[in-house]
Structure formats: C-alpha cells, structure tokens
C-alpha cells in the first residue's frame, strides 16, 4: 500500500513541474511557518484568486465592467464598454489607469499564484491594447514609466514568452513597442532609434540564435540602450560574457530591469544588483 506521505510527495513534485508559480507560493508559505511566523488567515487569503479579483475591482460599476472584460480576455466587450464610457464623457486617462490597467494587473497576479495561464494573459493583453488605443485617440500621448522595445531575435519564431513579458511590462506602466519574432539586429536598431527606447527586451528559445542577442547588445552600446536578455536558451553565465546586457529569468525580472534602467541606473549597476 502506498503511504499517504508518498502520495503527497508525488503531488508536490507534479506541482513543481506543472505549476511552478503555485509551487513557489507553497514553499514560501511553508518556510515562513517553519520559522515560526504566523501568517494568519488574512495573509493566506491574499493568495486566493477571489481576494485578488476583489481587491482590484474598481468601485465604479462601469469601470468594474471594463476591468472584468479585460480579465476575461474579451476584446470585443472591452472595446464596446470603453467606447460607451468615452461617449459619456469619461476621462480617457482615468479609464486607462483605473479601468483597463487593473484588468491586466489582476491576470498577472493570478498568473503569479498559478491561477491563470499564458493564453489568458495573452487574451487579456489583446483586450487591454484595444481599449488603450481608443483612449489614446482621445488624449494623444499617455505618460508611461518608460519605453521598451520587445522582440524575439532573428531565426526564432517562438514568441509566447515574449508576449507574456510584453503584457506584464504594460501592466506595470511601460509603453511596449512589440516588433514580433525573427527580428534582425539591423531592424531592431532601427526601431530602437525611431522609438527613442530606454531598453530592449530580447528573448530566444533556441541556442542556435542566442548569439544574436550578444550582437544586438554590442551594437546598441553606442546608443546607450541596454538589452534585457531572457528565454529558455539564455542564462546568466551567457549574458555575463558580453557588455550592455542584463539577464532576466522571469517576466517579473524584466519589470525590475526596466524600472531600474528608466530610473537612471546603468546596465552595470542593474546587473550587479540583480545577478
């Protein structure tokens, strides 16, 4: 007979493999309890999907409907509701900050605890973009934390990870110029100059293409635009072999890098802090 402890261990390892975010939360909470820190009911409650949604829901019911549409990844409904509110005279900047952004932020927080997945983030991101574009038409430029160019380097067509990073950067207040996948160094440099970007986030899933990130970082050094490098084929050791680059293992690392670069830190300072 299999003991209960064996079943529990098996399930824990399955969670680590299939739901790493949820596994991390479990481990973090377990460590705190082991150290004698009482998390209390409220702390545990904050890890639940229901609590996260409740905390992010705007008090204004019209705004809450927009937020929910973004969470559900319903682009058509998001656009319809945004148009209706703009026609009612709602401030477009306020709509972006307090109706649209809470939606994508909620989905990203749910992803962090293993309660949402890549397809849901991508759908929410599309819904967000649809609403933001409508608001931009009314107000012109929206003030962002900074401008980031996002891309998958030449030779690699895999862009799911890049899309996740772009969505989470947008959720944290950054303007993202998404170039897509299979982007040459020349095209990337041209786009960076045209956008006057603060940072490039470059990813690749393939070891055969990762050298392109090195070339891009070296070329952009003269433009004083660093490259945050990530993806399955990239690790810290590789990134530290060339200048003007910082390694990010997770999408949230990209946010940390962007915030530090846009705050005026050099790539060397950011690398020293985060590596």
UniProtKB/Swiss-Prot annotation:
Gene Ontology CC, one term: cytosol
Gene3D superfamilies: Cobalamin-binding domain, Methionine synthase domain
GO molecular function: cobalamin binding; metal ion binding; methionine synthase activity
InterPro entries recorded: Cbl-bd_cap, Cobalamin-bd, Cobalamin-bd_sf, Met_Synthase/Corrinoid, Meth_synthase_dom
Record domain B12-binding N-terminal: where: 53-147
Pfam families given in the database record: B12-binding (PF02310), B12-binding_2 (PF02607)
Location of the B12-binding domain: 145-272
Annotated GO biological process: homocysteine metabolic process; tetrahydrofolate metabolic process
Keywords: Cobalt, Metal-binding
Superkingdom per UniProt: Archaea
Binding site for methylcob(III)alamin: 158
Function: Harbors a corrinoid prosthetic group and acts as a methyl group carrier in methanogenesis from methylated-thiols.
Family affiliation: Belongs to the methylamine corrinoid protein family.
Protein name listed in UniProt: Methylated-thiol--corrinoid protein MtsB
Organism expressing this protein natively: Methanosarcina mazei (strain ATCC BAA-159 / DSM 3647 / Goe1 / Go1 / JCM 11833 / OCM 88)
Lineage: Archaea, Methanobacteriati, Methanobacteriota, Stenosarchaea group, Methanomicrobia
């Amino acid at each position: 007979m299999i003991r209960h402890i064996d079943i529990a261990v098996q399930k824990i390892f399955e969670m680590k493999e299939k739901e790493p975010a949820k596994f991390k939360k479990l481990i973090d909470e377990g460590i705190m309890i082991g150290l004698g820190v009482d998390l209390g009911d409220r702390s545990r409650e904050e890890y639940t999907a229901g609590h996260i949604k409740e905390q992010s829901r705007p008090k204004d019911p019209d705004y809450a409907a927009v937020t929910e549409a973004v969470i559900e990844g319903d682009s058509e409904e998001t656009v319809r509701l945004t148009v209706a509110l703009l026609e009612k005279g709602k401030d477009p900047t306020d709509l972006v900050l307090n109706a649209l952004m809470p939606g994508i932020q909620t989905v990203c927080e749910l992803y962090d605890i293993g309660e949402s997945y890549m397809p849901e983030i991508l759908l929410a991101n599309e819904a967000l973009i649809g609403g933001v574009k409508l608001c931009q038409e009314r107000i012109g430029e929206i003030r962002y934390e900074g401008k980031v160019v996002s891309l998958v380097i030449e030779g690699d067509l895999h862009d799911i990870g890049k899309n996740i990073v772009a969505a989470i950067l947008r959720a944290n207040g950054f303007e993202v110029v998404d170039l897509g996948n299979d982007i040459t160094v020349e095209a990337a440099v041209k786009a960076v100059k045209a956008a006057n970007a603060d940072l490039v986030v470059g990813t690749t899933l393939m070891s055969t293409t990762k050298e392109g990130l090195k070339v891009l970082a070296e070329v952009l050094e003269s433009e004083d635009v660093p490259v945050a490098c990530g993806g399955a084929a990239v690790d810290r050791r590789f990134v530290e072999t060339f200048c003007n680059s910082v390694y990010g293992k997770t999408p949230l690392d990209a946010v940390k890098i962007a915030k530090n670069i846009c705050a005026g830190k050099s790539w060397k300072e950011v690398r020293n802090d985060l590596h």
